[in-house]
Amino acid sequence: MVLNQNKNSNKAEYGGIVVSVFYLILFFLILNITIYFHKSTNFTVVVKNSVLTSFFVNLLLVCLQGIFRLKTCDGMRYEISKFNRYLKLGSVYAKPLVSFNQYQDQSATYRQKTSGFWWMNLIVYLVGSLVSGLVSLL
């Protein structure tokens, strides 16, 4: 799913890996910042609170990114919505750039192509958070 081929560029898309690495780096950054600014002298309490803070901040960002991705229109979704408007309204202005067969193919495979992105990032983030939390507690 990460190495999904794009018809326009014929290159592998590595967006999922890049975003997952970004979230892992962000996790460690927030972890270090919260440890640095914590006022307590008990190191284990500081680390536990920092891991929890970093985990929930990143989890919120992952959720927001997933919602944002579902709400935005990339090229394929835009063409599908144009075709739906064209079929409903019969408007010349909404006439899509794809044929009806292409529309059927794209609308049938669109969810399959984009559904793994959100879950893959979440799983990689959770595994990375677990590993970094365990390492920081040692």
Swiss-Prot record:
Keyword Transmembrane: yes
Compartments (UniProt record): Cell membrane
Keywords of the record: Cell membrane, Membrane, Transmembrane, Transmembrane helix
GO cellular component, one term: plasma membrane
Membrane topology note: Multi-pass membrane protein
Residues that span the membrane, as ranges: 17-37, 43-63, 117-137
Annotated protein name in UniProt: Uncharacterized protein MG076
Source organism per UniProt: Mycoplasma genitalium (strain ATCC 33530 / DSM 19775 / NCTC 10195 / G37) (Mycoplasmoides genitalium)
